[in-house]
Amino acid sequence: MGNSFDFGVLLILLKYFKSSRSQNGHSKQIRILLLNEMEKLEKTLFRLEQGFELQFRLGPTLQGKPVTVFTNYPFPGETFNREKFRSLEWENPTEREDDSDKYCKLNLQQSGSFQYYFLQGNEKSGGGYIVVDPILRVGADNHMLHLDCVTLQTFLAKCLGPFDEWESRLRVAKESGYNMIHFTPLQTLGLSRSCYSLADQLELNPDFSRPHKKYTWSDVGQLVEKLKREWNVLCITDVVYNHTAANSKWIQEHPECAYNLVNSPHLKPAWVLDRALWHFSCDVAEGKYKNRGVPALIENDHHLNCIRKVIWEDIFPKLHLWEFFQVDVYKAVEKFRGLLTQETWRVIKSDPKQHLKIIQDPEYRRFGCTVDMNIALATFIPHDNGPAAIEECCNWFRKRIEELNSEKHQLMNYHQEQAVNCLLGNVFYERLAGHGPKLGPVTRKYPLVTRYFTFPFEEMPVSTEETMIHLPNKACFFMAHNGWVMGDDPLRNFAEPGSDVYLRRELICWGDSVKLRYGTKPEDCPYLWAHMRKYTEIIATYFQGVRLDNCHSTPLHVAEYMLDAARKLQPNLYVVAELFTGSEDLDNIFVTRLGISSLIREAMSAYNSHEEGRLVYRYGGEPVGSFVQPCLRPLMPAIAHALFMDITHDNECPIVHRSVYDALPSTTIVSMACCASGSTRGYDELVPHQISVVSEERFYTKWNPEALPSNAGEVNFQSGIIAARCAINKLHQELGAKGFIQVYVDQVDEDIVAVTRHSPSIHQSFVAVSRTAFRNPKTSFYSKDVPQMCIPGKIEEVVLEARTIERNISPYRKDENSINGMPNITVEIREHIQLNESRIVKQAGVTTKGPNEYIQEIEFENLSPGSVIIFRVSLDPHAQVAVGILRNHLTQFSAHFKAGSLAVDNSDPILKIPFASIASKLTLAEINQILYRCESEEQEDGGGCYDIPNWSSLKYAGLQGLMSVLAEIRPKNDLGHPFCDNLRSGDWMIDYVSGRLISRSGTIAEVGKWLQAMFFYLKQIPRYLIPCYFDAILIGAYTTLLDIAWKQMSSFVQTGSTFVKHLSLGSVQMCGVGKFPSLPLLSPSLTDVPYRLNEITKEKEQCCVSLAAGLPHFSSGIFRCWGRDTFIALRGLLLITGRYLEARNIILAFAGTLRHGLIPNLLGEGTYARYNCRDAVWWWLQCIQDYCKMVPNGLDILKCPVSRMYPTDDSAPLPAGTLDQPLFDVIQEAMQRHMQGIQFRERNAGPQIDRNMKDEGFTVIAGVNEETGFVYGGNRFNCGTWMDKMGESDRARNRGIPATPRDGSAVEIVGLCKSTVRWLLELSKKNIFPYHEVRVKRHGKVVTVSYEEWNRKIQDNFEKRFHVSEDPSASNEEHPNLVHKRGIYKDSYGASSPWCDYQLRPNFTIAMVVAPELFTAEKAWKALEIAEKKLLGPLGMKTLDPDDMVYCGIYDNALDNDNYNLAKGFNYHQGPEWLWPVGYFLRAKLYFSKLMDRETNARTIFLVKNVLSRHYVHLERSPWKGLPELTNENGQYCPFSCETQAWSIATILETLYDL
């Protein structure tokens, strides 16, 4: 759902704010994870911190379904077990049936990776992982070290020397300001002396001991603890799970731990090739191929081409590698012949999908493969049992086997082609490439290619060697080396069966290490798993973290198992990894499964300063001026936390690749990133070569504050860039600890990068300007003209200025014993100086940009390549005060603003009153003006909605218009949005918001003045901060206003779910008071009618709330109020929400307009009313009934005075108070007139009131059938029900023809009439309603019809006339030939076009809700099932059966063509999916499901919740915050629909009320 969730979160947040302030004033951080059906998020990274609460909530696809969430996050105090899952309990704060607020939660107090999944019923429906960060602690006081504060330095352990000298060498890291040391493995090394080839994982490297003193892990542990406690430095070290040194003693004792030719026979062909290439290499070294163009010293492409030729001509032909994959043709044919000649042989029925194919020999012997003889017998069938037929069959079989063998031969050729290419690529890199190691002549020590397998025996000819591969006691020692495969899938193990990496020579091989074979579980290789677990536990006992070496090649299940063991001993284990997967999705799989805390990111991957700056922005922090995010918000996918390193121990030397002058600026850029940062020992001393993990045997230098620069074995602040590094590291830690979480990167020019770190609470910034030197300044041109820089705010100090300089000392000479750097290069640094003391800044001027923007213009004079300068910048004092005052006033909405707040006495007096106190005096009608009002509503007052240039106008003039946009851009921090641009560019929007409210009167103006007072300070802060604080002010005001609105509503709303509250705002949205009254005036004798002072006449006037039918099309003027729409919506929007007075006034206002026994549809203030609809009066009567039942003392309305505008049909409109009648008299008149029969011609009939209607259509007829009691009316030229589309196309010849006349007795009107008659009967029996009957003249006589008789007639005739029996032989059908759906209820009875009666439409569900007594439960249920199957869409109900010949589900009112059924939107009610009938359908289902069995009822509740969840989603995503009038088929957007419609919202709210 993305950030459409934002509005729902806002509403939850309101409840939450009141209850969850913790003691320290901070609100608990809560993240919400929406669960959606079949959403598998294993590749999505969700990062959380300890102390957070994670809530799982049901997304729309799961609401109403039985969902159970499982997780392996343990109970408090329990040990984590990856395989142990528990279910979470659902909590429902409202305890309602509605699922929109239901959640289950985890309180996160433990670090690591945790899995969750959820079941729908018993089926897994989705899942994913969450990663909880560790909490790192250092120092004697055990204070917290935030991950973004980490400054790490890598040490090659073997270069630390004897253990008793470590402290003096490690002190360099402490003095340089590092707070974490990463040691390469400390274990015994293998023969190659590579730091990562370990001979014994459990033993400390003996090199660290002295002859007289053996050091142990315990000694290492004591040192690590001392560093943590006394130096504030944490220690981590590598874990290497993929390989062990080839000379490891334990691997010889347990060869099953490696990939050998016994447990991995698929490697035999690769081994044979490997041995052949080794012998070829030895021959080349001895000069045996010199005369073939392959000398021992490979020097050019010609030599490479000759190698290719020799391999293809001499080596491959002798090896016959294809034979390992082929069938012995002779043996196979003979076996086949034997089976054919057996007497028991019979034809086997073949599966056409199965074809003859080679079955690989699992032992990989030459010609050891087979085929499935059953398939062969089913494929090659002799036509008789004679020898000739059998021989013919054998020949066909032989031919097929030869073809299959040939395919294997071709495949092997393809593999061999790749093997040669890879081999030559390797030779080129090692011997010819400029960036390669240039190994020189081929020797046994440096062979032509690295061997892929160990061979611990005397050498012998290739053919003799091959015999050993089938001797298990020998073959088990032929072990595969490890390495890496370029571009390979890291989730695939390249040594397992199915991979041809070794055969195709695609492995870049580490010949000193053997790849370890774990299998899928500890039982597959018990010794290896136990050995590596012990190794892990040693590390976890003594170190605070681990670096997963070569993580992308480590089997995930192995790393999971080992890290689980480590976390048992070190719960807050810091896990660092290098990943080279090439894909963020793949990275995320490793991060989420293993709970990796930080991924190593390399600055050396940047090819220029632009890219280096981009990486800073990519790896951490949010943009400067970001929006404040609420403490309760959706859980958003994250990118892995970065450990951003200027150089890793694997990188080539940057001094060689770039220049020595780049060390300082690049390290400054890296350190300004809002993430962990790191480096490698040697970088700061400016060691001008890569310190090799394999060949380097010298020791690091020691710390000596007194040492001279020329002293090769010691270093101090005079050496390299150490002094600057110390200042930069301290700054990095300060920025991380003090919340400088916002980052801005400015690429000033080709070489200069400025990185800003900003604190969003105190609004201080640190700006680091670095001039990189990717090219050597001595040999490349750099301009002396440096661009001027503008820094917004006031520069408080220069925190650091540093320049890389050359000093007069003899240049670098590589020392024999110590890893020494360049003594002649150092940095000149000055810290914490004033701007005027700077040697890099020439001058700094002050200028202003706009009215309040204070800017310092910096001119540089000595910003040479290799220089950096860091400024500490505050807002100018005036802006700083303004921000502080703003934050102080915002603390009433959120404790987040306490930091950096400033209380003053001289602010505007209105700000001394809490906003909630001001707003609490508002009525809902006033809140309508503050929050909503669309363009046409606002235009009535002479205004309009705010228009954002180059984008669009806001949907509402009120705050909701702004909040809808902010809800979209806030979660994404989309500061580049035109909305934000407009705010930064000027005060227009700010002034608009407060100005439109101040121009009104009363409390609305007070709200406007409060906003204006806040905006006074807002305008004084820098423009880049305005979007953030504008949002904060509005969200505080907006959420307060919502809360005040709900407090004025019913308890159903106040205690309701987010969805209920959300819908209830439709009442505020649709009900308002315009500049001109929309309703006729009520009787002056009503004492509680709202009044206002007319600003023009200065006279008191009624100002009753009216209900808009829909926005934006039916919102103002005479088109705002419609009788039918008003009374379909009134129960949901006014009665359920508890707005009883407004409901009463609307009922009475319409009562005053009764004429001809009808309520008008188009109200037109009463004076322009049109009495052309047959159903509005019945909806009005239904609402009076609902009012009486739902409102306390509701029956009192019956006695309320109604001011009759038209006491007779032909009266001129009378002023209010001229003739008052009690409401019960008006009701009786309506009933009497219908029974008498209504017939009249509309006033002013003709094009002046309807330009499309034919003349006959202006005649209005209504009455009651004497026999059935059914209300009837209409004719084929008018449309008097809600399906009221009148044709308007001349081209298609449908002008003046109603698409859906629905004349006769429309089913919903019959239902509404029955409901009213039944109710009046009940009231009359209790003498509450004074009439027991209606009196009418018939044939010159007065006839009485009692309500009892009328009620009985409808009851007796309804199912008889309306139900279409499932039995075709039923005799009650007048037009059996027109029936095309059985088991349904007709849409009408007695239509002039009888086939219209039989159309399936959703109107019968209305009758079911208002008069359920008319329906037999079983028949009703069947009809509802058909309606569900045929009519129910995603949001609405199809208005016509899709099987109907005139069905068309797409409404296009602009289309004018020759199609009679479509032109000019003729199909308005012939298929498009209208929303309001869904409410009645769902309510009917709920009602009748209770009359069925319990399972049916439960299923129905699921259905209702699931359907409603789609409305919830639409409501949240809609910028109008409403539900539309209709959609096109299958829920597609319809541009001709009202974006938010009163009756759509109302009937969904009614459904939730019933639920």
Swiss-Prot record:
It comes from the Eukaryota. SUPFAM superfamilies: (Trans)glycosidases (SSF51445), Six-hairpin glycosidases (SSF48208). Its EC number is 2.4.1.25, 3.2.1.33. GO terms for biological process: glycogen biosynthetic process; glycogen catabolic process. The active site is at D549, H552, D650. The keyword Glycosyltransferase applies. GO terms for cellular component: cytoplasm. Gene3D superfamilies: Glycosidases. It catalyses: Transfers a segment of a (1->4)-alpha-D-glucan to a new position in an acceptor, which may be glucose or a (1->4)-alpha-D-glucan; Hydrolysis of (1->6)-alpha-D-glucosidic branch linkages in glycogen phosphorylase limit dextrin. It is found in: Cytoplasm. The N-terminus is blocked. Ubiquitinated. It holds the Pfam family GDE_C. One of its GO terms (molecular function) is amylo-alpha-1,6-glucosidase activity. CDD domains: AmyAc_Glg_debranch_2 (cd11327). Keywords: Cytoplasm, Glycogen biosynthesis, Glycosidase, Glycosyltransferase, Hydrolase, Multifunctional enzyme, Phosphoprotein, Transferase, Ubl conjugation. The modification Phosphoserine is found at S87. Multifunctional enzyme acting as 1,4-alpha-D-glucan:1,4-alpha-D-glucan 4-alpha-D-glycosyltransferase and amylo-1,6-glucosidase in glycogen degradation. Belongs to the glycogen debranching enzyme family. Monomer. Interacts with NHLRC1/malin. PANTHER family: GLYCOGEN DEBRANCHING ENZYME. This is Glycogen debranching enzyme.
